From Swiss-Prot:
Domain comment as written in the entry: Cytoplasmic tail plays an important role in virion assembly and morphogenesis.
CC terms in the record's Gene Ontology section: host cell plasma membrane; membrane; virion membrane
UniProt KW keywords: Disulfide bond, Host cell membrane, Host membrane, Host-virus interaction, Hydrogen ion transport, Inhibition of host autophagy by virus, Ion channel, Ion transport, Lipoprotein, Membrane, Palmitate, Phosphoprotein, Signal-anchor, Transmembrane, Transmembrane helix, Transport, Viral ion channel, Virion
Name this protein carries in UniProt: Matrix protein 2
Any one of the GO BP annotations: symbiont-mediated suppression of host autophagy
Quaternary structure, from the entry: Homotetramer; composed of two disulfide-linked dimers held together by non-covalent interactions. May interact with matrix protein 1.
A Pfam family this chain is assigned to: Flu_M2
Topology in membrane: Single-pass type III membrane protein
Record text on activity regulation: The M2 protein from most influenza A strains is inhibited by amantadine and rimantadine, resulting in viral uncoating incapacity. Emergence of amantadine-resistant variants is usually rapid.
The organism's place on the tree of life at top rank: Viruses
Phosphoserine modifications at: S64, S82
Length: 97
């Protein structure tokens, strides 16, 4: 059965689809896929900030220190902390008169 053979006609109750064989497995599969696509699209629009923020920033956690000796872990932590610490020497004090 071709989908082009379906006819939509206006009735008293609204638009209805008069299909000769609506139990066709292809039609059922297409309906299920369409409904799932709609649900996923709605969820994506509702939670896109959360999802994409997690993908963008959640995966950038740095290298794993699992399996490394404790001394190397401590050295790595100190390097990371020193990269974050602010050095007061680089600031310029401006005094307004």
């Amino acid at each position: 059965m071709s989908l082009l053979t379906e006819v939509e006609t206006l009735t008293r109750n609204g638009w209805e689809c008069k299909c000769s064989d609506s139990s066709d497995p292809l039609i059922i599969a297409a309906s299920i896929i369409g409904i799932l696509h709609l649900i996923l699209w709605i969820l994506d629009r509702l939670f896109f900030k959360c999802i994409y923020r997690r993908l963008k920033y959640g995966l950038k956690r740095g290298p794993s220190t699992e399996g490394a000796p404790e001394s190397m872990r401590e050295e790595y932590r100190q390097e990371q902390q020193s990269a974050v610490d602010v050095d007061d020497v680089h600031f310029v004090n401006i005094e307004l008169e």
